[in-house]
Structure formats: C-alpha cells, structure tokens
Amino acid sequence: MSSLSVRFLSPPLFSSTPAWPRTGLAATQAVPPVVAEVDAGRLEPRVEEREGYWVLKEKFREGINPQEKLKLEREPMKLFMEGGIEDLAKMSLEEIDKDKISKSDIDVRLKWLGLFHRRKHHYGRFMMRLKLPNGVTTSAQTRYLASVIRKYGKDGCADVTTRQNWQIRGVVLSDVPEILKGLDEVGLTSLQSGMDNVRNPVGNPLAGIDIHEIVATRPYNNLLSQFITANSRGNLAFTNLPRKWNVCVVGSHDLFEHPHINDLAYMPAIKDGRFGFNLLVGGFFSPRRCAEAVPLDAWVSADDIILVCKAILEAYRDLGTRGNRQKTRMMWLIDELGIEGFRSEVVKRMPNQELERAAPEDLIEKQWERRELIGVHPQKQEGLSYVGLHIPVGRVQADDMDELARLADTYGCGELRLTVEQNIIIPNIENSKLEALLGEPLLKDRFSPEPPILMKGLVACTGNQFCGQAIIETKARALKVTEEVQRQVAVTRPVRMHWTGCPNSCGQVQVADIGFMGCMARDENGKPCEGAAVFLGGRIGSDSHLGNLYKKGVPCKNLVPLVVDILVKHFGAVPREREESED
C-alpha cells in the first residue's frame, strides 16, 4: 500500500427566471430532518480495515447489492496495487469470458482503474476516464492522449465530460499497461475515476486568470485529487464507498462548478476575518431521485479542506447503506441521520472532534449574472486574454487534439482548460496574438469562438453509440435537432439544451433550460420508438435550481416542433418566416 504524502497548505489565493408549468417533479428539494431518531447500533461502522483494504463486515452483508458482493469476491484495487492488470492484459477475451472472476474483472472491477468495457456495443473496447483536477491539462498530455486514440482508427475518439475531464475511447485491454505507464509519464492518472470512488474535482475553469474570481480553485482541487488518489498511487481508505461521490470548490459568483449537484461543495466564506469555506452536502442525480445539496452548517478554514473532506468521506464510507443501489448516495444517509446527526458523525472524525458552525453568509453575490466562457475575454493579467472554444457536444478526434495542443503552445502557455459545458479554453494569450489565433483553420472550421447561439449551450452525454446504459443516441441527434430548430426560429438570448441517454443523467438535463432524457416512447401508431422526457427551468449560476419534468415520452421525431414551441412561448424566439416578413 502506498503511503500518502500531501502538504495541506493553502496558498495566498483569496481576493477581493420564468415560472415553468409542472407535470412532474424532477428534483427533491425537501430538506433532511435536523435530527432523526437513530438506534445507537446504526452508528457502528459497517467496514473495517483488513490487510490495507477496507472491507464490509460480515454482520452487515445480508441484503447487500450485487456490486457489494462483487467487491467482496475480489478486491478491485488489487488489479492496480498488486499487478493484476498486467496478468489480465495478457489473456484473450475468450479466456477471460470463460472465467466468472476474470469476466467480472473486465466488466466491473477495472472501473476502479478508470476502464469501462463497452461489452454491449463495442465488445473488447474500453472507455478510459482520467482524473483532471479543475479541468486543467497540458499540451504534452493532450498529445499523448491523441497518440493513444489515433491507433484505434474509427473506434478511437475523446470526449470532454461534464466534470471537466477527458474520456478516451477505443482502448483495447492488451494496451492498458503501456497506456497507464504513459499516463504516469505525462502526469496523468485514470485511477479511482469510476464506480464507488470520488470523481474528478471540479473548479472554476478561469482559476488564477479570472478578473472577478473570489478564490483560485486550482490549487485546492489539486490537493483534493492528490489526497483522494494518494498522489496517483491509490488511496485505499476511499476506494470502497457505498457509491460514487462528487466534489467541487467554488471560485466565482458564476458557480461554474454547479455546487448544488455535488456531494460536497466548498463555498467561499469569511468568518471572523478569516477566509475559508461554508459546506454544502448531498447533491446528486440518479434514476430514482435528484436532490439539491443542503447546508451542513459548517465552516472550515482554507487550511482544513482536506481534513473535512476526509471526515465526510469516512462518515459516508462507514455508515452509508449498501443495499438497494438506488438508495446508496450520500444524501440518503443524510436523510436517515438528519442533517445534525450526519454533522455529528463528521465531527467525530475531525481532529479534536471540532467543526465550526457556518459563517452567516458566503461570498457569492446572489444577483450575479453568469458570464459566458466562449469567445475572447480579458484576463486579470494585463495584456493577456483567454479564448473559449465551442466543442460541438464535446467530441474530438486525434487530429483535433494535436491541433489544440499546437495552438496552446503557439499562442498560450501550453495549457488547455476543460469546462463542464464540454468546451475548451486556451488561456494566457498575448493580445497581440489574438488576431492570428482567430484566423487559424481549426477555429474557422471546427471549434468556433463564435458559434450559433443555440449551439453554444448544447451538451450531450455519450449516448448509445458507446454506452450500454443509454436508451437513445444523443450526440448526433442533439446536433441534428438543434440545427433544424435554428432553421425554424430566431433566438436572441442563450438557451442551454442538455441531452442524456438515460435516467442516470450524465448529461445533467436537470440543470438545463431545456433538457432531454432518453426513454422509450410510442409513436402515433402505438409502436415503441426512441423518445425523450423533456425538462424545463433548470437554473445555474448564483440562483441555481434544478428543472422540472415538462413532458414525458415524446418520440424523438416529434422533438423539433416541441422545442420550437417552447422557445417561442418561453424564450422569446421568433419564427423565421415572421422575422423575414417583419424585416
């Protein structure tokens, strides 16, 4: 087991909608009880450490879900910690599929290493998810990822995710040991990025360059990622959580990080003249329930962000339920214990068992209008600008990545920044170089800094092209529907449209102005067809709120007229024929 070596020092970072019709509730806004009646035995930790790994105690194994049984059958992290991936990579898929354990290794346990087998749609091919704290990557890292996917031809591509991360596709198992080595050499890891682990820490994509930033989030997210993965060597204390767990550090009034949908969100706040963070906990999406994060009534100094993260993770790991998989996210535990009961369990796990109450207010301006990241914008550094590029539904090819890396080196500082809207920012560009950058073919032909207004806010998950859980195809359909809608109506203000292929909501439809969640529907003849549930009214920024279900089971072929109608009624869009007649 690797030892953890992280210095918990905070750098000097601090510086000074319409009402929607509701046909169904998309999110749970109910506040957990302050105190809940809980039997003392319920507070006994359900896991214990054995030979360096955290294991579910035998007395708590009745009624556990299949994934928990799989973890007990073989510890997933042994594939990384004890070289199991090397042996697995030498086996043929035929050999692997003949053995129950090996088959579950490639289908489930490899997710602890960030590898997802696409058995249903691309047998023998894997998606690899990285860790990219705060969404920052270098040109060298980008070139390496391009070299990986290029060898896979039409099966190889990469996606920008809604957690400021890279996912690369087309990977074959025999290449994995060499890929992992290459990732390490360029300062990347895929470790602990899937299944019951902490996902990529999200922050302000403008950290350190933002004219209006409250605090630079990048150093904090780097610390969080180093802690969570033990400097990319594996932190076994947090690889057996009841379910996945999301964290973000908020750095500006814009709330680019979407704190209301994270399990833990650090909200900048001053208390007694000291800079630190108020804490929100419990936000999540799932097919069963969507819940907005709630205040923990806790404040920590900037020096203590790791300590409180550790305490919250330990409370969740120790006490979270492991039965029905749809009721294992941290908010279910908060509901069961009550917010004060959960807080007390966190306090027990803090040094000296102390945790200050929240500052009266955080530093977020409540009436702040969220800024646009796409386009050319000045930085806080005189003479420098950043350029936000629109990446249509987040999809890039190997040649695109090489070109992006070249642009980052030629015009910037060799750095790219990914956003939760699946776009990319090139920072630190000398103003004298802007004209040349804007004239580059890649920006003219592929990744525009001035996309059409409806394309600008378009987000889409992987869809059933690659994902076995997706019910519908999303990326190509999102582009096609949006293109057709643009031909029919003129829109004068941004409208964010998100697509997700299934109720897991990787496309985060509940935060969109208009969201589309894949489902099976019935056409005019009553026959099953691909469809979508439509959501309206999601808000982001300082007035964040989850949207509501507007209409169920709309056949995909009927979405264009519905979207046109919504845009005209709720967003001031004008039909093209009317616009032309008025002109």
From Swiss-Prot:
Disulphide bond pairs: none
Q: What is its main location?
A: plastid
Q: Which InterPro entries match?
A: NIR_SIR_4Fe-4S, NiRdtase/SiRdtase_haem-b_fer, Nit/Sulf_reduc_fer-like_dom_sf, NO2/SO3_Rdtase_4Fe4S_dom, NO2/SO3_Rdtase_4Fe4S_sf, NO2/SO3_Rdtase_FeS/sirohaem_BS
Give the E.C. number(s): 1.7.7.1
Cofactor remark from the record = Binds 1 siroheme per subunit.
Q: Which UniProt keywords apply?
A: 4Fe-4S, Chloroplast, Electron transport, Heme, Iron, Iron-sulfur, Metal-binding, Nitrate assimilation, Oxidoreductase, Plastid, Transit peptide, Transport
Entry's family note: Belongs to the nitrite and sulfite reductase 4Fe-4S domain family.
- The answer, when asked if Iron-sulfur is one of the entry's keywords, is yes
Q: In which pathway does it act?
A: Nitrogen metabolism; nitrate reduction (assimilation)
Record GO terms (molecular function): 4 iron, 4 sulfur cluster binding; ferredoxin-nitrite reductase activity; heme binding; metal ion binding
**Compartments, record wording:** Plastid, Chloroplast
Residues annotated as binding siroheme: 506
Reactions it catalyzes: 6 oxidized [2Fe-2S]-[ferredoxin] + NH4(+) + 2 H2O = nitrite + 6 reduced [2Fe-2S]-[ferredoxin] + 8 H(+)
Q: Supply the Pfam families for this chain.
A: NIR_SIR (PF01077), NIR_SIR_ferr (PF03460)
Asked whether the keyword GTP-binding is assigned, the reply is: no
Q: Which SUPFAM superfamilies match?
A: Nitrite and sulphite reductase 4Fe-4S domain-like (SSF56014), Nitrite/Sulfite reductase N-terminal domain-like (SSF55124)
Q: Tell me the protein's name.
A: Ferredoxin--nitrite reductase, chloroplastic
Q: What class of enzyme is it?
A: oxidoreductase
- Inducing factors: By nitrate.
Q: What is the required cofactor set for this protein?
A: siroheme; [4Fe-4S] cluster
Q: Which GO terms describe its cellular component?
A: chloroplast
